Regions:
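Basic- and aromatic-enriched surface patches that contact anionic nucleotides/nucleic acids
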Residues: 4-30, 34-202
Length: 202
């Protein structure tokens, strides 16, 4: 099965995709998320997720409750660290199956240099006065657009220096490259609905 990243995140919001309570907590650190986002930007493979479709799920993580009227739902058995990281970066929020307190290291606030595609967590001295450094989440949420950034950069440079066309094209191209991550295919292996919980986790 192939699912796009934004479809996976939408299914979480639409109560169709859950994390079982027996899954370990979110333990990824910033370096892991930086590496994942770098792989996605460079279009490298990022592994598969393993899900289990069931109409009798075990206890679910967080406040999620299953109602029989929902029919079959999917549980993430493997890939939860990646999915949680993507949810936090693309949406800028903690996914519904966690609370803020349960997130050991908040991996949001990852910035990208839209000219070089370098990724770093926010450092005021390096980024505070440089329009090229943008919070990745702001790009995914369309809170900043390439043309606006080019304008901000021109203001910073002043009237004496014009931005070269090649540089403008590169910034637009990099914005598109980042925005296209949400449409990237994620391979999903699905355990059949008739499997028992023991078979699913084996």
């Amino acid at each position: 099965l192939i699912m796009k990243i934004n479809q996976i995140l939408d299914k979480i919001d639409e109560h169709q995709l859950y994390v079982p309570a027996f899954q370990r907590e979110y333990v990824w650190k910033r370096k892991h998320v930086k590496s994942l986002m770098s792989s996605l930007i460079n279009e490298y493979p990022t592994g598969t997720i393993l899900s289990w479709e069931t109409s009798s799920p075990p206890e679910l993580k967080g406040k999620s409750k299953y109602h029989e009227t929902q029919g079959a739902v999917k549980l993430i058995l493997d890939g939860q660290q990646r999915i949680t990281s993507l949810y936090m970066i693309l949406k800028g929020e903690i996914p519904p199956y966690y609370t803020e307190k349960e997130i050991i290291q908040d991996t949001r606030n990852l910035h990208v240099n839209v000219e070089t595609l370098e990724l770093e967590y926010y450092i005021k001295q390096k980024m505070g006065n440089n329009p090229l450094w943008v919070n990745l989440t702001d790009i995914f949420k369309k809170e900043i657009k390439a043309h606006q950034l080019v304008k901000d950069l021109q203001v910073k440079l002043g009237d004496d220096e014009n931005i070269e066309d090649e540089r403008i094209d590169l910034i637009h191209e990099n914005f598109n490259k980042i925005e296209s991550i949400k449409d990237r295919d994620f391979l999903e292996q699905s355990i059949p609905i008739k499997a028992t919980i023991r078979e699913a986790i084996d």
